[in-house]
Amino acid sequence: LINSIKKQDYPQDLITIFVVADNCTDNTAQIAREKGAICYEHHNPDERTKGFALKYLFEQIQRDYGITSFEGYFIFDSDNLLKKDYISRMNDSFDAGEKIITSYRATKNFSENWIASTYALHWLRSIRTRHRARSFLHLATNIQGTGFLFASEIVKDGWKYTSLTEDRALTADCVVEGYEISYNDEAIFYDEQPVSLKVALRQRLRWSKGHLQAFAESGWGLFKNIFIDTHTQRYDDDKWYNYTWRTIRHRFMSFDTFAQLLPKNIINIFRWIIVYLILYPFFCSQFGLDNIRILYNSTWLAHGITHIFGDITVSLPAGAETYVL
């Protein structure tokens, strides 16, 4: 990663490389320093997420340099590689006024096995259906862990996102504050994907937990913004229709991000319990059933069973004694 940064076509005297060696027991810190990076070592077994490492890093930057002494910050994972013009492309968006920008995530090990390939397709789907579409409409896309740039003003008070998915928390908080998260399709970096099913499942579980944490932290703020927008800035020379368009866009960005974080599966589980295990048995005990189909062709399994055996129906007379849950 450090070598690929040093090979950028962007002026090297304008780049400062910080590395946080998070609970490392190898010679990561030594190698980083030998390569010319400023390395901070973080040792705390109770703080093992990436968010805590970044929190510690920005605390050290604030102490030694001042966070706002730099215009912006890139976030990368240690296994990332950058295309030669990556920083220049991202800087073009930054100079155009964008405050937080994500980029094109390519896969280093696409052909290693089927797990890496499916991850690569997952990120490609995200690029095609999430980043490009939202960026075209000037809405907020979402940060995905690595390969993004943000203005120092966003973390002027330090890094506060320490949940399991700090990227989702950052996304939600920035949208709440009225920032448009843009996407640069020409800035390409390469990321290594998991090749172990165990690692992939553990990562997915971490993502699921992190999404719930991000919703708990920022869900209410996003929901309020849908109806009461207090963060869209109004300029002195603003035409009324320009401000109206920006506030409508911010409300829709809040709704979009809220919908992405909303734990729909958990809500569906509670709905299933209330409707099918409580209300429906009560209805049946009071009014009975008359030739009600058990299976509907909503799944391939149900379709196959009904194709072989035909419609399976049930009839029950009314009365609590004839219908027992």
Language-model segments: which ranges?
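A conserved acidic beta->alpha catalytic loop
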Residues: 21-29, 44-46, 81
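Long helical/loop segments within the catalytic core of UDP-sugar-dependent glycosyltransferases
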Residues: 41-66, 70, 84-163, 175, ...
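The conserved acidic donor/metal-binding loop of glycosyltransferases
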Residues: 77-81, 174
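Membrane-embedded multi-pass helical conduit in multi-pass membrane proteins
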Residues: 260-325
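Acidic donor-binding loop at a coil-to-helix junction in glycosyltransferase catalytic cores
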Residues: 164-170
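Catalytic donor-sugar/metal-binding loop of nucleotide-sugar-dependent glycosyltransferases
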Residues: 138, 171-190
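Short, acidic, metal-binding catalytic loop of nucleotide-sugar glycosyltransferases
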Residues: 3-14
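Short aromatic/hydrophobic "clamp" motif used to bind/position activated sugar donors
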Residues: 73
